[in-house]
Swiss-Prot record:
Record localization: Cell membrane; Cell junction, Plasmodesma
Task performed by this protein: Modulates cell-to-cell trafficking.
Gene designation per UniProt: PDLP6
Signal peptide start and end residues: 1-22
Residue numbers on the Cytoplasmic membrane side: 278-288
Record field: transmembrane: 257-277
Pfam families: Stress-antifung
Keywords: Cell junction, Cell membrane, Disulfide bond, Host-virus interaction, Membrane, Repeat, Signal, Transmembrane, Transmembrane helix, Transport
Subunit and interaction comment: (Microbial infection) Interacts with Grapevine fanleaf virus (GFLV) 2B-MP.
Disulfide bonds: C32-C110, C84-C95, C98-C123, C145-C212, C188-C197, C200-C225
Entry membrane topology: Single-pass type I membrane protein
Designated name of the protein: Plasmodesmata-located protein 6
Family in the record: Belongs to the cysteine-rich repeat secretory protein family. Plasmodesmata-located proteins (PDLD) subfamily.
Amino acid sequence: MFATKTVLFIAVVSLLGTFSSAAVDTFIYGGCSQEKYFPGSPYESNVNSLLTSFVSSASLYTYNNFTTNGISGDSSSVYGLYQCRGDLSSGSGDCARCVARAVSRLGSLCAMASGGALQLEGCFVKYDNTTFLGVEDKTVVVRRCGPPVGYNSDEMTRRDSVVGSLAASSGGSYRVGVSGELQGVAQCTGDLSATECQDCLMEAIGRLRTDCGGAAWGDVYLAKCYARYSARGGHSRANGYGGNRNNNDDDEIEKTLAIIVGLIAGVTLLVVFLSFMAKSCERGKGGK
């Protein structure tokens, strides 16, 4: 995932909703370096400064990268970038809200880690102690495919049309394709050149075709780009991508909350009962 010597642990992946309607702060993936920094160190100060710059800049720009230099000769320099999905704007505040959420989650996920990256539905943030800016990285981070749809010539034609439009080199760094009920989206990070972006996207799209060609939907995230396709509003990917899994999870959450509330109520009643019994005993002793 990182183009550095650090080793990353990819956090639990949970892709939810379709790209057009899912909440922009839906968690996609996150990873942190094994290497840690010391609390109170100059590097920690530079990381905090960098992440703060992300949030401030996102109210004006949908992409930016920063280098926070340390003192000459030390190892406290930190490099980072953020990027919002191509259909989000800085003017509406959607980009800034997403980046702020991503920075907050990254701070919790990668506390004291020298490097970290986090992808939400609407934005991506990354920092490291070794520069990765302008470096193409086609490492596979996430690859998920939906259930097979079986042979359907119309469906396959639409899918090929959508994926083909994503592969068009004239599409820029953010690309959208639509055919019937199918839609696709692809994007690479803003630090790549046009040639590097096309190369990265072709790798992601190629994997999407090969690995998810007969699936109802598919997602391939590489370290510096991604490509996805899905039926518009036709499925939910919560916790394993099953169409009804989200409702089941909500039911489980409600059941858990009901149990917790019941336990709290039971404990409260027990405390009241014991208090009443204790007072009754005291009155009984006082009357003797």
